[in-house]
Amino acid sequence: MKNIFKLTALAVFLCCLVSCDDDEPIIPTLEVTPANLNGTWELSEWNGTPLAEGTYCYVVFNRKEQTFEMYQKFDSMYARYITGSFSIKNDPYLGAVISGEYDFGNGEWNNKYIVTDLMESGSMIWTAKDNENDVNKYIRCEKVPENIIAEGSYEKSVIYWK
């Protein structure tokens, strides 16, 4: 009788293990390193919404120097070309956190960002460390469009002449 009870308990336990299956597939992500960020990225969504027409942000990361070039048009009627350096730190609770500093003594980025879902297919999510509602989705692209480089270069030359 004891053996039947043990076998029944074992059979129930094994059935429970077999029935426990995660229906969602695990999508592999890349480790957040300067090498995996290297290249050109376009901001495609801000807080789940596509960018308004006429606004853009392209970031070009250089893994060797850990520098960035940014072409953006958000808070001004003119495009801006911004340069600086970045660093990635691994927080044991949050994961990879990216931060940056602008060149020419213009200070640090307003936020540090938790980088998640860095996909081999070419997308990643940045969430502001101090504001979980500030979420940015970047997609990898081949290069910054020439007209945007020209627009950013024009603004750069205007700034230096002022």
Task: List each language-model region with its residue ranges.
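Edge beta-strand at a domain terminus
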Residues: 81-91, 128-162
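An anionic, turn-rich surface loop/hairpin at beta-sheet edges
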Residues: 96-118
